[in-house]
């Protein structure tokens, strides 16, 4: 099965989970993320990147709220316009969002839309340099026991993750139903060191 076929099959399987099961599994995954967060030294200001769930993805919103309550700065991906992406060599950046400001962040409401730098209030939603992240929660479509990750095919995280500090905790999250025997990979595909599933 090639990547496109696997992607369709696993998304269909994920979509078939009923809403209550998805909510319960998302809550269990968020609880495990909070446990991990609590084990990290929070003496210094810390920053975690999460994502806004789309469709039937694991929803990390409860984890983001818990991180903010613990004093962590929370950042979300913002897709870049073609001009901005060409200028920086990346298709996305991370922008900090205050806990009470998530509903006003257009890149949270529209996570796949590309925004020009001038579209976003950078004083309200500042860009967080990749090397400033202490933890990042990565969405995925499918995964296997080796940590291989299948995303949506855009390569955004495969290009972004190498820019992180070696100390950054990288965690993929998924439902158990997204586990497969083997994820086909190419040279640019990165394995995730940690995947939490339920």
Where are the regions that the model predicts?
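N-terminal active-site beta-alpha-beta segment that forms phosphate/nucleotide-binding
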Residues: 1-132
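Conserved residues at the C-terminal ends of beta-strands
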Residues: 51, 139, 198
């Amino acid at each position: 099965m090639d990547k496109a076929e696997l992607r369709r099959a696993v998304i269909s399987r994920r979509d078939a989970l009923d809403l209550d099961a998805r909510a319960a599994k998302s809550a269990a995954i968020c609880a495990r993320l909070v446990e991990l967060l609590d084990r990290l030294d929070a003496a210094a200001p810390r920053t975690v990147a999460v994502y806004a769930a789309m469709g039937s993805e694991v929803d990390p919103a409860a984890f983001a709220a818990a991180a903010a309550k613990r004093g962590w700065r929370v950042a979300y991906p913002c897709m870049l316009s073609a001009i901005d992406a060409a200028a920086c060599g990346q298709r996305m950046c991370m922008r900090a969002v205050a806990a009470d400001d998530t509903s006003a962040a257009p890149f949270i409401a529209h996570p796949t839309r590309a925004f020009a730098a001038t579209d976003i209030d950078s004083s309200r939603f500042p860009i967080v340099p990749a090397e400033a992240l202490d933890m990042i929660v990565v969405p995925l479509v499918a995964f296997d026991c080796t940590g291989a990750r299948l995303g949506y095919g855009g390569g955004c995280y495969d290009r972004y993750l190498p820019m992180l500090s070696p100390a950054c905790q990288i965690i993929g999250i998924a439902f158990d139903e997204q586990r497969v025997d083997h994820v086909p990979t190419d040279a640019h595909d990165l394995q995730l060191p940690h995947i939490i599933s339920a």
